[in-house]
């Protein structure tokens, strides 16, 4: 008799500092623009103010987009939900996952975050990046266990040439 494994779904959302990491250059540029536009008798201060305001709207949209991102790891699938005005949901079957990678940019190292990349045999989503994961989370081990159980449940065995 085959043993049945039931795990609760894991929901992962990017850490809010990932927004600062991704958009630091635009945050600085917008701040400098507003400061410059506030200077009396500055050349083109109205234009700089309008551009800074538009950049602020763009940053607000990107912040909402990042906050609405959600990764769900279930027993059978890895689900990625994203979008603001146009919502999309990408599904990846766990038994198709073939490899993992953890990486950190310099800024992610400063804020103790990482990006976990998941590679699969899926045609539409061969690589899925889970961004803004806290360093203390051992996500790869958790996903690897679920992948192995999913493959065992479906009697899928990997054959390698060595």
Outline where the language-model segments fall.
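N-terminal basic, Ser/Thr-rich segments that initiate or prime the first beta/alpha elements at protein or domain
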Residues: 1-162
